[in-house]
């Protein structure tokens, strides 16, 4: 019997398309506004993975014509100091988007810090005002990763209306906003998590399965409905027997690709889409300046 292989949902290609569209839109709007869009990225401490993500975001900004204002602070920086920096960025007319790179050192309250960002400059879409707008179905800046997933599904013309969608993970970064966006698209949504009983029986019902639990290889082929759309949000750095570090998702890709209809790779699936939506959110805030 011939084994079918799932079609890849190529986040890298779709992200490149979004970046190209943004580049054109920025070129057209910049003469009217008189400056490029601006994104401020705040990083605290020396987490190597965070530093790599920040470099990646700055590179993406340069590619589309967004000015990036990178601000790197020592690990011992206080909440009060960061609060002052964010207040200044809120008032800075050159800055359209503000992003605090997570995770933060233990002594800093990430949620309280995110509250300090002007909701209209909340490039990550994590401010309570923007999450509230999402709950109400209102226009606002949306959480980058789940919005990136939605755009990916849209680009591949994957129908969501009336479909059974299962989100594994309930974080405020991905799981909860992801469920709300799927609900908004008329899917029937189930959220599963670490306390769910018999995860396998839940995921086997999914037409659309979103894995966002942060547990490497959690989803295996026997947990997937044949022909399902499997989106792997997990980004887990693991060390193999030779001591080399590599990135793997929450889905066991090799086995699941033989069952699913569509699947995202890790890396190259959801990651590039997250960055593309970050740029999109910054541009959305920037374009408001043209209307003022």
UniProtKB/Swiss-Prot annotation:
Bridged cysteine pairs (disulfide): none
SUPFAM superfamilies referenced in this protein's UniProt entry, alphabetically: Aminoacid dehydrogenase-like, N-terminal domain, NAD(P)-binding Rossmann-fold domains
Pfam families xref list: THF_DHG_CYH, THF_DHG_CYH_C
GO BP terms in the entry: L-histidine biosynthetic process; methionine biosynthetic process; purine nucleotide biosynthetic process; tetrahydrofolate interconversion
Pathway: One-carbon metabolism; tetrahydrofolate interconversion
Keyword Lipoprotein carried by entry: no
Keyword 4Fe-4S: no
Gene3D superfamilies assigned to the protein according to its UniProt record, in alphabetical order: Leucine Dehydrogenase, chain A, domain 1, NAD(P)-binding Rossmann-like Domain
GO molecular function, one term: methylenetetrahydrofolate dehydrogenase (NADP+) activity
HAMAP family, alphabetized: THF_DHG_CYH (MF_01576)
Binding partners and assembly: Homodimer.
Protein name per UniProt: Bifunctional protein FolD
Protein species of origin: Nostoc punctiforme (strain ATCC 29133 / PCC 73102)
């Amino acid at each position: 019997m011939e084994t079918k292989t799932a079609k890849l949902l190529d986040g890298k290609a779709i992200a490149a398309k979004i970046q190209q569209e943004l580049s054109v839109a920025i070129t057209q709007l910049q003469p009217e506004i008189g400056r490029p869009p601006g994104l401020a990225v705040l990083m605290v401490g020396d987490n190597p993975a965070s530093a790599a993500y920040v470099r990646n975001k700055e590179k993406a900004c340069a590619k589309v014509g967004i000015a990036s204002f990178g601000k790197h602070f020592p690990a011992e920086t206080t909440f009060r100091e960061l609060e002052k920096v964010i207040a200044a960025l809120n008032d800075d007319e050159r800055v359209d988007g503000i992003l605090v790179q997570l995770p933060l050192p233990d002594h800093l309250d990430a949620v309280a810090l995110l509250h300090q960002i002007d909701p209209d400059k909340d490039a990550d879409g994590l401010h309570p005002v923007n999450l509230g707008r999402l709950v109400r179905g209102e226009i606002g800046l949306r959480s980058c990763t789940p919005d990136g997933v939605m755009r990916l599904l849209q680009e591949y013309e994957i129908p969501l209306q009336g479909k059974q969608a299962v989100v594994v993970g309930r974080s405020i970064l991905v799981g909860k906003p992801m469920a709300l966006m799927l609900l908004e698209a008329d899917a029937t949504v189930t959220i599963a998590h670490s306390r769910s009983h018999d995860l396998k029986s839940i995921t086997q019902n999914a037409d659309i399965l979103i894995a966002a639990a942060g547990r490497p290889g959690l989803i295996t082929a026997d947990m997937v409905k044949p022909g399902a759309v499997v989106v792997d949000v997990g980004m887990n750095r693991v060390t193999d027997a030779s001591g080399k570090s590599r990135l793997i998702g929450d889905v066991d890709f090799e086995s699941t690709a033989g069952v699913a209809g569509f699947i995202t790779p890790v890396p190259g699936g959801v990651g590039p889409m997250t960055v593309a939506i970050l740029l999109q959110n910054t541009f959305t805030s920037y374009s408001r300046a043209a209307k003022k």
